[in-house]
């Protein structure tokens, strides 16, 4: 899907292939925004190894990015009624799998919770609140509406032909500071991770829209 654009956008192509193969990607936002890198992965095929990497090398705040329709169907209320976060990140109430977990904190338990959320519907919920996974509401329109890691992760899942759901966690240095610049590049080389910027993803999507608008 969308392979006609891949040659022009090699980083997007590599990220899509990684998502399809169940491998993580490093997604960077704009320098004048958060200026941070998140490890992201498709929710439906995230591996135990990737989840352990997120818990070990990232902030520990494992987030499940979902499209607006899914958040509404699962009736996930906003974490607060008056969101005053600087970038308006769409946190909802936290979640946990209703069954099949122990403390909810381990890598396996968090994957179980994510799987339970993806299996849930308005009629049959397999999750409870509160919990140790933080759902995020991705705005309709993706990175063309909001240039956030939440939207970028869901956009990439869609482009990979997967469910519009992704997992992310902010990459950190061993000393507890945020990883940036060369620190991100070193980490990417160490683990052979594709690196993608939200700017590249936005340009890719804009090019798709332009091509779709061309007369047949």
Curated annotation (Swiss-Prot):
The gene is ribB. It comes from Pseudomonas putida (strain ATCC 47054 / DSM 6125 / CFBP 8728 / NCIMB 11950 / KT2440). The lineage of its organism: Bacteria, Pseudomonadati, Pseudomonadota, Gammaproteobacteria, Pseudomonadales. Keywords: Lyase, Magnesium, Manganese, Metal-binding, Riboflavin biosynthesis. Binds 2 divalent metal cations per subunit. Magnesium or manganese. This is 3,4-dihydroxy-2-butanone 4-phosphate synthase. It comes from the Bacteria. Transmembrane segments: none annotated. GO terms for biological process: riboflavin biosynthetic process. The keyword Metal-binding applies. HAMAP family: RibB. Pathway: Cofactor biosynthesis; riboflavin biosynthesis; 2-hydroxy-3-oxobutyl phosphate from D-ribulose 5-phosphate: step 1/1. Mg(2+) 1 binds at residue 34. One of its GO terms (molecular function) is 3,4-dihydroxy-2-butanone-4-phosphate synthase activity. Homodimer. Belongs to the DHBP synthase family. The record marks 132, 170 as: Essential for catalytic activity. D-ribulose 5-phosphate binds at residues 33-34, 38, 146-150, 170. InterPro entries: DHBP_synth_RibB-like_a/b_dom (IPR017945), DHBP_synthase_RibB (IPR000422).
